[in-house]
């Protein structure tokens, strides 16, 4: 690819394939085609028992929950507009601008809510798909309207190169999208594998042993009161900004300035905040949906959190990583959380309540193996997530530089 000098004020992208130098042409989508949609389908024409999927705006891009008869489908497909293979279907309401490539399956789409541009051979669909991912629809900027009308589509500006260059650009992004999709599938598979292991490696339904365990371990897990294993840490700051401020979230523990993108929202006076030493737990003690996340400080030797976030550590008989997974994924904590809910919508999990919970716990060596296993699995998942995020950022950069 050749990079174009920024000083050259021409209708060309910053980055393009070698051999292409002509200006891109400015057009409106309405000059290149017209908006098409399927014939209206009424509710009494749909059923869960018919043969042909009927996609409404709520199921567009996912699984259908309504179907039409084969006879009606064939009649309407013959008489009224119907997409061709490769056409880019667009959501015109709800989440405006979502796209699905029509692959040729027998299926029908809700009129006016799902549309496509019926265009001539001046437009390449692969190129058009990528354009849709960055387009600013005419007339919708700053609007609160949640509908994309035909006029919005037809009046939208587009800059296009030759069809040969369009095809090269479209193929480039198609390969990149395929790579992103492959990494997404790998990531999803790892997450599913973790979910399966979590279900099998902790006892459930009153059992004293898990369904799946490491070789060499056969003893029953024993019931223990968690308070026998965890120790509250009550040290508080004595001066302002004594240590970095943490945010303990459902996605992990973060420096607050990173979590809020450069801003620190804690009180300017954080004297009296709880101190969190490295390796210690902290968590938000209240929840509206029975979900609590117990985060371990692996960011700094010391950090601080609001007094709404208790701090504790484990003694030498309980592996902290093992405990973290058991609290997040074990059935005992979910049941215990439900018991703490006393009217209203909010559940409070004070540390003294947590200390009263009864857990089935294996010997320390087995704890360590379980904790290490899931930690390694999480690190693998995080690595795949970083790769996926990088690919998405690379695509974003290419889109900015390869379109006018």
Where do the language-model regions lie?
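Short amphipathic coiled-coil heptad-repeat segments
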Residues: 1-21, 185-219, 386-404
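DNA target-recognition patches
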Residues: 30-33, 43-74, 230, 234-266
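A short beta-sheet element
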Residues: 56-57, 67, 71-133, 149, ...
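A short glycine-rich beta-alpha junction/loop motif
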Residues: 9, 92, 108-114, 143-167, ...
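Non-catalytic DNA-recognition/assembly elements of restriction-modification systems
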Residues: 15-39, 213-237
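Extracellular/lumenal glycan-associated surfaces
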Residues: 19, 167-179, 183-186, 222-224, ...
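Short, recurring structural edge motifs at helix starts
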Residues: 1-5, 14-19, 41, 139-145, ...
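Short, charge-patterned binding micro-sites
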Residues: 27, 105, 208
């Amino acid at each position: 690819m050749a990079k174009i000098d920024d000083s050259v004020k021409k209708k060309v992208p910053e980055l393009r394939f070698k051999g292409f130098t002509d200006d891109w042409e400015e057009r409106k989508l309405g000059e290149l085609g017209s908006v098409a949609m399927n014939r209206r389908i009424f509710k009494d024409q749909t059923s869960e028992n018919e043969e042909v999927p009927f996609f409404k705006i709520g199921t567009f891009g996912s699984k259908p929950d309504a179907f039409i008869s084969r006879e009606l489908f064939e009649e309407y497909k013959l008489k009224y507009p119907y997409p061709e293979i490769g056409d880019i279907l667009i959501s015109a309401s709800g989440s405006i601008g979502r796209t699905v490539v029509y692959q040729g399956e027998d299926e029908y789409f809700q009129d006016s809510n799902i549309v496509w541009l019926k265009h001539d051979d001046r437009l390449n669909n692969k190129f058009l798909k990528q354009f849709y991912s960055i387009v600013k629809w005419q007339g919708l900027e700053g609007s609160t309207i949640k509908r994309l009308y035909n006029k919005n589509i037809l009046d939208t500006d587009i800059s296009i190169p030759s069809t040969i260059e369009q095809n090269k650009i479209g193929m480039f992004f198609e390969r990149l999208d395929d790579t992103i999709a492959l990494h997404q599938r790998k990531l999803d598979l790892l997450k599913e594998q973790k979910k399966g292991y979590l279900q099998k490696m902790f006892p459930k339904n009153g059992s004293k042993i898990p369904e799946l365990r490491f070789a060499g371990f056969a003893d029953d897990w024993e019931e223990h009161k968690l308070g026998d294993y965890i120790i509250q840490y009550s040290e508080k700051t004595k001066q302002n900004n004594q240590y970095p401020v943490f945010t303990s979230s459902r996605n992990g523990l973060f420096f607050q300035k990173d979590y809020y993108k450069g801003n620190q929202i804690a009180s300017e006076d954080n004297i009296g905040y709880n101190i969190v030493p490295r390796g210690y737990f902290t968590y938000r003690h209240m929840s509206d949906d029975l979900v609590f996340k117990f985060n371990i400080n692996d960011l700094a030797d010391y950090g601080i959190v609001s007094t709404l976030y208790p701090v504790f550590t484990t003694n030498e008989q309980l592996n902290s990583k093992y405990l973290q997974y058991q609290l997040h994924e074990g059935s005992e904590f979910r049941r215990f959380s439900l018991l703490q809910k006393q009217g209203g919508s909010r559940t409070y999990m004070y540390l003294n309540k947590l200390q009263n919970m009864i857990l089935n716990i294996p010997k320390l060596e087995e704890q360590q193996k379980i904790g290490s296993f899931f930690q390694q699995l999480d690190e693998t998942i995080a690595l795949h997530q970083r790769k996926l995020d990088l690919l998405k950022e690379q695509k974003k950069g290419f889109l900015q530089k390869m379109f006018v």
